[in-house]
Amino acid sequence: MRKIAIDAMGGENAPEAIVEAVLKAKPELPEDKFIFFGDEGKMKELLPADDDQIEIVATTEVILDEDEPVKAMRTKKDSSMVVAANWVKEGKADALLSLGNTGALLTCGIFIVGRIKGVARPGLMPTMPVESSDDGFNIIDVGANATSKPEYLLQWAEMASCYAEKVRGVSKPRVALLNNGAEFDKGDDLHKEVYQLLQDSSLNFTGNIEGHELLQGKADVVVTDGFTGNAVLKSIEGTGSVIIHMLKDGLLNNGVKAKLGALLAKDALKSVASRFDKDKYGGAVLLGLNSPVVKQHGRSDARAVYYAVKQIDKILTEDLTNTFKQEFSK
């Protein structure tokens, strides 16, 4: 039975939303066991007793969003996140899911779970929506690394392409390099060198992609440095929130005609909202570690966490980590 470590105390809606999500997913995943790390009293109130798929590990501390990541990992040794990461390191759990402090989770992933031998730097990779289909695209790195070298981006592209193929079911994933122009000689020295490395690789490299093309479905995997990727991710998320707010305000607060228009456009608006629903893709994966570590947004509700649980099950089913270990040990 596969064992998934759940940081039950991370996120704004913990532990209730996390427990609700796991209990919803559990009947669909009979081969998985869920190990909850957190406040034992709260866990016992929310979880069924005598369930072979559920285990509770009592912890006494919580890493907060305002905590400094490295210091939190070192000083809050009995926090739900740190204890869960140690269980994964020791082989008592196969994967880790957390909604907690992103920096702390990255730190725990890198320094406790550990890098795969041969991987220079792990990369953080979410799946984002596109306008043309429900397939979405992966973008890596979105903030695990402040600085980058060409070989890092090549490895991220290789791992992300493998993820897109095995977990998302994309045949021959199209890999693109985020750059400031489509031409091969665009960008700084880093991007020019990465372009050549990708072109010389066995990946299905389609060239550069510009920021305005990201949501158009032109690539299945987009590789970028962590600084740029983080800025792009937050820009996409922020723009989406603003558009939704503006639509709601415009349709509901501009008289009877606007409300009638909203009613007539209801199905179309639902279709658009569904297409750009990033929750259905699960969380962001820290690729390149000895075991899967998935970060879901701290504000996630039970529905979003449910998809992250299903995502981890798929990653374990496809044995993605061992694929990476075999590839990078050559």
UniProtKB/Swiss-Prot annotation:
Its EC number is 2.3.1.274. GO terms for molecular function: phosphate:acyl-[acyl carrier protein] acyltransferase activity. Keywords: Cytoplasm, Lipid biosynthesis, Lipid metabolism, Phospholipid biosynthesis, Phospholipid metabolism, Transferase. It holds the Pfam family FA_synthesis. It catalyses: a fatty acyl-[ACP] + phosphate = an acyl phosphate + holo-[ACP]. Pathway: Lipid metabolism; phospholipid metabolism. It is found in: Cytoplasm. GO terms for biological process: fatty acid biosynthetic process; phospholipid biosynthetic process. Catalyzes the reversible formation of acyl-phosphate (acyl-PO(4)) from acyl-[acyl-carrier-protein] (acyl-ACP). This enzyme utilizes acyl-ACP as fatty acyl donor, but not acyl-CoA. NCBIfam families: plsX. HAMAP family: PlsX (MF_00019). PANTHER family: FATTY ACID/PHOSPHOLIPID SYNTHESIS PROTEIN PLSX, PHOSPHATE ACYLTRANSFERASE. Belongs to the PlsX family. This is Phosphate acyltransferase. The lineage of its organism: Bacteria, Bacillati, Bacillota, Bacilli, Lactobacillales. The gene is plsX.
